[in-house]
């Protein structure tokens, strides 16, 4: 019930946003960062405390590698709207990227205490525990989440990361494969397999990745993951020119 209520609140929140912010989100979805950034900055000049605009601008900053700016924007957004759980989650993720693990843990603890049945926030807590080196505890939490949501690709991928770091590559591979079986356009799962540096993709998996890149609705982050995974897979097959092409395309989007 709590998860459904949270989802309903988020839907109502999105419906309440100005049309211009929804439009900027669509532009960002298409990977047009420069255009989205300009429009977002112009909007913030008129409404400097709009937390959704700050959140969008932080996403752009994060994609461009300006994590300090992203953190600053989200910290202020959370201060302006402390009850917005999604803002806190985004703030937590940026803190993690900046390796500010103690601050990230505080945000995870707050979210889990405030929304004890929210599986997404529980997964964020597991990731923070993993970052602190307690891989067994993190895997236990991921497993508890998967009992309730067995096909959640993000949790399966995160569990794979924990298993990999814990030195259990075979179970990690299984977890990554379950993730991309559950959601074929989940590029991170394929990239994670490539990132093992020991995995050999099957021909069918290479074909699947190429087909996913033909999907015009594929998220830009997933597109990057697929290009990089294909670069690894094709290089291993001796298709060096095609592999380099995918590497270039991935870097262009990134």
What are these regions (language model features)?
Residues 1-254:
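Alpha-helical solenoid repeat scaffolds of the TPR/TPR-like class and their adjacent stem/linker regions
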């Amino acid at each position: 019930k709590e998860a459904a209520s949270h989802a309903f609140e988020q839907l109502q929140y999105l419906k309440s946003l100005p049309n211009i912010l929804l439009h900027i989100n669509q532009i960002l979805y298409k990977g047009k960062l420069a255009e989205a950034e300009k429009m977002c900055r112009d909007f913030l000049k008129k409404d400097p405390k709009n937390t959704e605009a700050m959140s969008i601008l932080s996403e752009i900053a994060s994609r461009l590698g300006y994590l300090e700016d992203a953190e600053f924007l989200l910290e202020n957004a959370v201060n302006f709207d402390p009850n917005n759980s999604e803002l806190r989650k985004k703030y937590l993720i940026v803190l993690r990227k900046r390796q500010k693990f103690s601050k990230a843990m505080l945000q995870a603890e707050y979210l889990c205490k405030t929304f004890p049945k929210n599986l997404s926030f529980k997964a964020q807590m597991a990731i923070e525990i993993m970052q602190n080196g307690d891989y067994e505890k993190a895997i236990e939490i991921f497993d508890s989440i998967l009992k309730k949501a067995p096909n959640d690709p993000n949790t399966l991928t995160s569990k794979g990361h924990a298993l990999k770091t814990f030195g259990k590559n075979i179970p990690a591979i299984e977890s990554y494969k379950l993730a991309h079986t559950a959601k074929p356009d989940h590029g991170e799962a394929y990239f994670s397999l490539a990132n093992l540096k020991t995995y050999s993709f099957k021909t069918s998996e290479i074909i699947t990745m190429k087909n996913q890149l033909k999907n015009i609705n594929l998220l830009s982050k997933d597109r990057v993951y697929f290009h990089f995974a294909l670069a690894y897979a094709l290089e291993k097959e001796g298709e060096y020119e095609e592999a380099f092409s995918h590497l270039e395309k991935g870097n262009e989007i990134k």
